[in-house]
């Protein structure tokens, strides 16, 4: 029934493409008119468009001429003309949708259309990439086009300093990575003044490789943290005990990535702990005093049984470096949380670093949803269209290719064992190599890529390896993977963002070959020779069948497999793709149904013999779909909890910004409310007789908060609670009036400066502890379901109560810190304020964890 409706009305995707095609016709209709403009007149169009927007026109009103101007500028500056399908892609981006375009269809150029149009409003456009290399490359490459139209372009890399960042954010268009943008947001909300902040708002973002950033990294929190005191030696002690455990002592759930001790394991580990004097003989492992020990054990088990070197992480310069499971790239600076990273360091016998406490955090899901308009580009988004729509309200639109795809996708070959599979892979590569067909082999881990490399070396097949160990050469290696006879091994989607061009990448080859040539004539001759060679090599590669992509294992996500296939057959080039699988592969072993294995056995699988069947391929896709659905459910569930924290983050950051934006502060409102709370908590009756206990309680609180000693003889004469409160308010009024007078003796603004700094420091201090408390609450909240309670509702209620409590502490802490302030006016008339405040256990000479680059004592530890 659905297919009949599609035939009559067309799919949603085809209807969108059809409607946008009419806009493309309008753009094409004025192409000749725009061609007649001089370079200056073309550039002046930007000023005209901005005037039209000021006079009431919308971006949609000027889309047609704006896109035509960008296309003409691109022809003149880059010698690249936007195809009609690229114009459709640009419209999709402008409309706040995801443009799914196949590899090689020119996504980088497509982004210029929507970026230019939206930059005309002057509110800023952010083009987001997955790494610094792509951000720098695209900013320099497309920057020439924007410059020709009078549009400013900025680029932020990891090493960019604060001043350069601020200037870049003030540009019309900014290129940067998701990590840089997210951490800048967190750092800005740890700054002490608006002037120190670098970002200017969240107007419009175009996210390149949107599936990688908004899906694959959705569960990865962005965290700024500082070290906390911890018993580091305990990790080593517990790690030594893990070797004593046998398989029957623990149960591993690979599907859910869980591990726990069996009854036999609990008994064994308890005895080992007692033997090593880590717990007393009359206690249980699950006693309240031993909960922290249980935490160390769980993380040590996970480190040993669930995480593997060269798959989940590598050891580099004596440190554990996490490997991104989706891209195969190193994630420098990232650390596993909750003690897992320390457990891995203990496992690998490395120096153990202290666990960190979160100072500020957010997720990419919540960060990118702050933008007024969001759009994205990728080669593979359709399989995750439900998630994009459900979480980000982003519709996926599949853009037709400029030239039909010529790639042939062969059926999967399935073998009994991994050894048989890899032997067949080597044989297949060898056959391709004989006819000079370029080959790209995708593996799921560094371990597998290096194992395959050894087999190729053994068979005397020259090749390049692209994995996290060789990240620096990534772009060059992948760019030359289309040269005839080239064999390239890549982990997952390493090199994503760089096209594989048949015959080789002329631009990169020229950059290397011409680096040491200075003579202009010699450069021209060499460049011509390189061009001829690339064209010859391209023809040889085409005759050999184009790029052959080999997958050595199916990924949990169909999208990752499609990305690998998509490296072949760019812009109508011929190509080939094939997957080699075995029953020992993780996907088939963990998620493949017994039905698949049963059918394969009935078919009589023999050694070194592959089985091909469309039914088996469909069954594998069903297994992948199950995993994708489960992962989506996990992300959706986590998002509901993250949304609670995100709402609180907005409240706290909004409060912080209000403090920063104020020039003067009336703290009397705060301390009068505080005094009322103190009196009401100690004196319960309106009329009372002051006894020693009541006086001591009042005096103790006032000394603690205000550093004031109450006079017993004075307050003992009051007959009502209201009179006591009135006297206390007057006492505190005098206390702060004297303090303000002392602070403003040389500088009228000194007191307000002090109040602002104390308020900001107090809020940061409490927010840090509040985040830790929320993390602890979230870790155990699912246990509430045992009592037939909804964990999410329980989390919302308790988190709200905790926030209220935090804000109460905040106001008290402000008054307490201001009351205990010391001041010192030096002879040179510059005022130095000394705070008698314990802020953190971070060394004062360490760099501040907020990321400012300053020493802690000159920043948040001031």
Swiss-Prot record:
One of its GO terms (molecular function) is protein-exporting ATPase activity. Keywords: ATP-binding, Cell inner membrane, Cell membrane, Cytoplasm, Membrane, Metal-binding, Nucleotide-binding, Protein transport, Translocase, Translocation, Transport, Zinc. It is a peripheral membrane protein. Its cofactor is Zn(2+). It catalyses: ATP + H2O + cellular proteinSide 1 = ADP + phosphate + cellular proteinSide 2. Pfam families: P-loop_SecA, SEC-C, SecA_DEAD, SecA_PP_bind, SecA_SW. PROSITE patterns: SECA, SECA_MOTOR_DEAD. InterPro entries: Helicase_ATP-bd, Helicase_C-like, P-loop_NTPase, SEC_C_motif, SecA, SecA_CS, SecA_DEAD, SecA_motor_DEAD. It is found in: Cell inner membrane; Cytoplasm. May bind 1 zinc ion per subunit. Its EC number is 7.4.2.8. The keyword Nucleotidyltransferase does not apply. GO terms for biological process: intracellular protein transmembrane transport; protein import; protein targeting; protein transport by the Sec complex. One of its GO terms (cellular component) is cytosol. Zn(2+) binds at residues 848, 850, 859-860. Monomer and homodimer. Part of the essential Sec protein translocation apparatus which comprises SecA, SecYEG and auxiliary proteins SecDF-YajC and YidC. Part of the Sec protein translocase complex. Interacts with the SecYEG preprotein conducting channel. Has a central role in coupling the hydrolysis of ATP to the transfer of proteins into and across the cell membrane, serving both as a receptor for the preprotein-SecB complex and as an ATP-driven molecular motor driving the stepwise translocation of polypeptide chains across the membrane. PANTHER family: CHLOROPLAST PROTEIN-TRANSPORTING ATPASE, SECA INNER MEMBRANE COMPONENT OF SEC PROTEIN SECRETION SYSTEM. HAMAP family: SecA (MF_01382). This is Protein translocase subunit SecA. The gene is secA.
